[in-house]
Amino acid sequence: MANILRKVIENDKGEIRKLEKIAKKVEAYADEMEALTDQELQAKTPEFKKRYQAGETLEDLLPEAFAVVREASRRVLGLYPYRVQIMGGVVLHNGDVPEMRTGEGKTLTATMPVYLNALAGEGVHVITVNEYLSTRDATEMGEVYSWLGLSVGINLAAKSPAEKREAYLCDITYSTNSEVGFDYLRDNMVVRQEDMVQRPLNFALVDEVDSVLIDEARTPLIVSGAVSSETNQLYVRADMFVKTLKEDDYIIDVPTKTIGLSDLGIDKAESYFNLNNLYDIDNVALTHFIDNALRANYIMLLDIDYVVSEDGEILIVDQFTGRTMEGRRFSDGLHQAIEAKEGVRIQEESKTSASITYQNMFRMYKKLAGMTGTAKTEEEEFREVYNMRIIPIPTNKPVARLDHTDLLYPTLASKFRAVIADVKARHEKGQPVLVGTVAVETSDYISKQLVAAGVPHEVLNAKNHFKEAQIIMNAGQRGAVTIATNMAGRGTDIKLGEGVRELGGLCVIGTERHESRRIDNQLRGRAGRQGDPGESQFYLSLEDDLMRRFGSDRIKAFLDRMRLEEEDAVIKSGMLARQVESAQKRVEGNNYDTRKQVLQYDDVMREQREIIYANRRDVITANRDLGPEIKAMIKRTIKRTVDAHARSNRNDAIDAIVAFARTNIVPEESISAKDLRSLKDDQIKEELYKRALAIYESQISKLHDQEAVLEFQKVLILMIVDNKWTEHIDALDQLRNSVGLRGYAQNNPVVEYQSEGFKMFQDMIGAIEFDVTRTMMKAQIHEQERERVSPNARTTAAQNIAAQSNQSSESSTQDYSHVKRNDLCPCGSGKKFKNCHGRKAF
């Protein structure tokens, strides 16, 4: 172990030496740049662009380009990047993560690699965690870029598509992680190329990269549409039932936060809903409502997992930042169950039209880099998932913060009494204090206690984060007391007020340990910026969530040996610190394994999504006739149908093929069994395809010009692809929920999901081609006046076409008595008969 540690330290030192060497090359240009006039310095940007286009690489340009930005920053902002900031900039340009402590100037560090990469003309995205930081950084650092001749855009959620497109066309675009993701999804749902807003994804520089790529890695970005539902009453009934339960009626697994009915609870459910068997197949929907009601009432906690806004809306609380996540909803009906629990209006369920996780969103960039003050603990994940190294950058000045040993109390009450006493004592001497909490309710509790103790303070949590930057900026003033959930206000420096250094600087008090050591380190790092003095102290109790779930037995045994009997007694021990860190490592390991598994599942969706979106983009951007593609789909649909009946009784097969042709391709009276009976399979395919081509040409001739033809072809394909893709996403979600149970049968759920997901994708492609064929053949196309119609009118017309073709196919009744349940359905959908036209029969 010692050898491994030594090797890691030596590697880090070697990396630092390389970075210092490059930084010295940048510094060597300082005098030359200082001697240039403003016009000469600004002329460097077009010069660099020409040199890049002439064949020089960005690496060739780096020392001089970085030096230009340094000098421009000095002239425009009055800030001159230190050597350690140059080193951080080099790491960012290389697509890695420089770990830079709080207050070391990460925002200024980013200007150098952002400028350099923007010279390529392919766009640079600077990603922040909220719109306040995007706007602030774009405004402040944008002065440097604009002065140097580069364009800067800010992408905000409230902007129109035209404004977003303009922002993305800039050399440098500031945006939040969620908005970039949603724009990507929306771009892959539009019908016209001019409605797209993004360029190809080139280089992303992510601020607070651990928050985005680790903490929110499992969070899917979902674009969904409302589904009309009559189920609100079921949510209410399930909630009413669950509220009648006692502790013996359900079982909670605390470490995994899962819940289910006990045998007693099952009996009560059957009695309450008047059922013979709760888990009968007919009651699957009801069990889903009950499961969600259980989670809502006994797992999801008010002011910890969610808050109720003043207008009665349920808002999710981000577990890592303590902020509310506006516009986001728990999926799979859980949000509606919480609405029923809290007695607010139950909103409609929604159906997912497109989704992507941050993991896969950011892996699509050609180059990805990020900045944070705390990433070393997640080094393995950054390397394995994102292929990014973590490079610790030395501080500009030595850290002078004093980190005290944790204090452990037997109960929550005794711990909080100690916290209040400590805060009051420090406030009285004028030392500013930042109190960090894990949950909103803890913030509120401490606030009430401080009011009772007569200590003036500010509260920063999910309920008032609009003021967070202002509150955080004042948190270093003499006598200031600030309570903040987790890392609320992250990204804003706490600068010390006059006379505070002499009082010991800012004191950070943690009211409990977080599951992640990284979050604790972030809280500590708020004190002692840029060599300032500071202190940190964590207060723990045996009743803390982390202790209760992962560490209390050993620690309790230790305390028993210490004969700790008084409630206000306190323990300070190195062994205790090691036990807490061990518990945190276990949780971090569990969380990493979970994220890894999510990625394995999402990779299946990623591969399929990329195929669908690439084909979609090809259709949207096409200036050519899409007839060959549609004809190929028709040909494959006919082939699939004929091949599906190759092994059937010949007469039955011919009857089924004729039924398929009448329903989906040719006019009903134009074909009969005798037309095909003497032909071989290949000849049948040729005959049907020949007839289909004639109908295709007839249909296309009804459109007045090539522009109208292309428009019709595009809308036809896109409408069907989008509809089938939405259904497929829903089916994959259901598959994912079901394969988990197969682990009990010694099957690997991920492998099962990959295998079945691939088959479902193949079926979906077949279903798309079948629907395109049927709609193309059976649609009623009317020649229209030569005029431009709105996109909405086009889409509506296409939907009407689909509805007409669906009506014609459903109205044709066929005899399927000869078809077996596991045969492919004669209609040509590509589905098994039992899952298609045989569904009612079976």
From Swiss-Prot:
Membrane topology: Peripheral membrane protein
Residues binding Zn(2+), per UniProt: C825, C827, C836, H837
UniProt cross-references to CDD domains, sorted A to Z: DEXDc_SecA (cd17928), SF2_C_secA (cd18803)
One GO MF term: protein-exporting ATPase activity
UniProt keyword DNA repair present: no
Cofactor, how bound (note): May bind 1 zinc ion per subunit.
Pfam families membership: P-loop_SecA, SEC-C, SecA_DEAD, SecA_PP_bind, SecA_SW
GO annotations of cellular component type: cell envelope Sec protein transport complex; cytosol; plasma membrane
UniProt cross-references to PROSITE patterns, sorted A to Z: SECA, SECA_MOTOR_DEAD
Cofactor requirements of the protein: Zn(2+)
Enzyme class: translocase
SMART domains: SecA_DEAD, SecA_PP_bind
Subcellular location: Cell membrane; Cytoplasm
Main location: membrane
Residues engaged in binding ATP: Q85, G103, E104, G105, K106, T107, D493
Catalytic function, reaction form: ATP + H2O + cellular proteinSide 1 = ADP + phosphate + cellular proteinSide 2
Protein EC: 7.4.2.8
Biological process terms in GO annotation: intracellular protein transmembrane transport; protein import; protein targeting; protein transport by the Sec complex
Any coiled-coil regions, as ranges: none
Keywords from the UniProt entry: ATP-binding, Cell membrane, Cytoplasm, Membrane, Metal-binding, Nucleotide-binding, Protein transport, Translocase, Translocation, Transport, Zinc
Protein family membership: Belongs to the SecA family.
NCBIfam families named in the record: PRK09200.1 (NF006630), secA (TIGR00963)
Cross-referenced PANTHER family: CHLOROPLAST PROTEIN-TRANSPORTING ATPASE, SECA INNER MEMBRANE COMPONENT OF SEC PROTEIN SECRETION SYSTEM
Physiological role: Part of the Sec protein translocase complex. Interacts with the SecYEG preprotein conducting channel. Has a central role in coupling the hydrolysis of ATP to the transfer of proteins into and across the cell membrane, serving as an ATP-driven molecular motor driving the stepwise translocation of polypeptide chains across the membrane.
Subunit-structure text: Monomer and homodimer. Part of the essential Sec protein translocation apparatus which comprises SecA, SecYEG and auxiliary proteins SecDF. Other proteins may also be involved.
Name listed for the protein in its UniProt record: Protein translocase subunit SecA
